[in-house]
Curated annotation (Swiss-Prot):
UniProt-annotated binding residues for dUMP: Q77, L78, V79, R80, Q88, Q89, S90, Q91, R92, R146, R173
Cofactor requirement: FAD
Note on cofactor: Binds 4 FAD per tetramer. Each FAD binding site is formed by three monomers.
Gene name in the database record: thyX
Protein name per the record: Flavin-dependent thymidylate synthase
Organism placement in taxonomy: Archaea, Methanobacteriati, Methanobacteriota, Thermococci, Thermococcales
Reaction catalysis annotation: dUMP + (6R)-5,10-methylene-5,6,7,8-tetrahydrofolate + NADPH + H(+) = dTMP + (6S)-5,6,7,8-tetrahydrofolate + NADP(+)
Enzyme Commission number(s): 2.1.1.148
Induction comment from the UniProt entry of this chain: RNA-binding protein that probably controls the regulation of its own mRNA.
Keyword Methyltransferase in annotation: yes
Known pathway: Pyrimidine metabolism; dTTP biosynthesis
Residues that bind FAD: S56, R80, H81, R82, Q88, N162, L163, R164, H168
GO molecular function terms listed in the Swiss-Prot or TrEMBL record: flavin adenine dinucleotide binding; NADPH binding; RNA binding; thymidylate synthase (FAD) activity; thymidylate synthase activity
SUPFAM superfamilies in the cross-refs: Thymidylate synthase-complementing protein Thy1 (SSF69796)
Species of origin: Pyrococcus furiosus (strain ATCC 43587 / DSM 3638 / JCM 8422 / Vc1)
Assembly notes: Homotetramer.
Length: 244
């Protein structure tokens, strides 16, 4: 199972965003005024300013996540979100040494449901690991031996995004039509944010959710799964209101 952890983020993120927003409106704004920004100031100004559509201020808060145990299929989708920073576990320098197929690869549930097919997958993956290790033992450097590894191999990656890019990411990847693995990662990222009292309010204020939450309707209405809107809104509201 993939593990997602919010490891770091901008100190006093909502106060930082509010302080940045007020530079345009507040005649008494100064560098020193940051220390005077209170929770009341945040609640008074931030929802209103975001309601005007002034979302560039969200870029002043950044969030760093650690993601462990997803496949390279997932990270190939993740890094398409270019306004972000990524550092991924290297297959060039780190040798894959797990013997357990389940610990080494992500196998979709659709494969596991077919017992015969599942056993064939595990057999091929075990042979892949064996040949990979044999290649290294025969003097092939891991940067070449890795060519045999499939996209299903588990990996680790650190992701840093600003809040505006996170909103864009969530809009696409929390959707029921997103690929299942990156959708799971996206929901866990949002859940990690919801655990923090100093972050949770922004989830609703900035509508950090799938596009049906952001727009108020599904932009892919003709392709929408039955009952999707109601199910997604209920799930999102539960996360947005959850506490650590």
């Amino acid at each position: 199972m993939v593990r997602v952890t919010l490891v770091n983020y901008t100190k006093r993120p909502l106060e930082t965003i509010t302080w940045a927003a007020l530079i345009s409106y507040w005649g008494e704004w100064s560098t020193e005024s940051f220390e005077r920004i209170s929770e009341n100031d945040v609640e008074k100004h931030l929802p209103r300013i975001l309601g005007y559509g002034h979302e560039s201020i969200l870029e002043h808060a950044t969030f760093t996540f650690s993601i462990e145990g997803c496949s390279r299929v997932c990270t190939h989708q993740l890094v398409r979100h270019r306004i972000a920073s990524y550092t991924q576990q290297s297959q060039r320098y780190i040798v894959l040494d797990e013997e357990n197929v389940e610990e080494t690869f992500v196998i979709p549930e659709s494969i596991k449901k077919d017992r015969e097919l599942y056993e064939k997958w595990k057999k091929v993956m075990a042979e892949t690991i064996s040949l990979y290790k044999e290649s290294i033992n025969r003097g092939v450097h891991q940067e070449d031996a890795r060519f045999i590894l499939p996209q299903a191999v588990k990996t680790k990656i650190i992701v840093t995004m600003n809040l505006r890019e996170l909103k864009h990411f969530f809009g696409l990847r929390l959707c029921e039509r997103a690929q299942w693995e990156i959708r799971e990662v996206a929901w866990k990222m949002l859940e990690e944010m919801a655990k923090r009292d100093d972050i949770r309010p922004i989830i609703k204020w900035a509508k950090l959710g799938p596009r049906c939450i952001q727009f108020g309707y599904c932009p892919e209405r003709d392709l929408m799964p039955p009952g999707c809107l109601k199910k997604t809104r209920k799930k999102w509201e539960k996360v947005a209101e959850s506490k650590s």
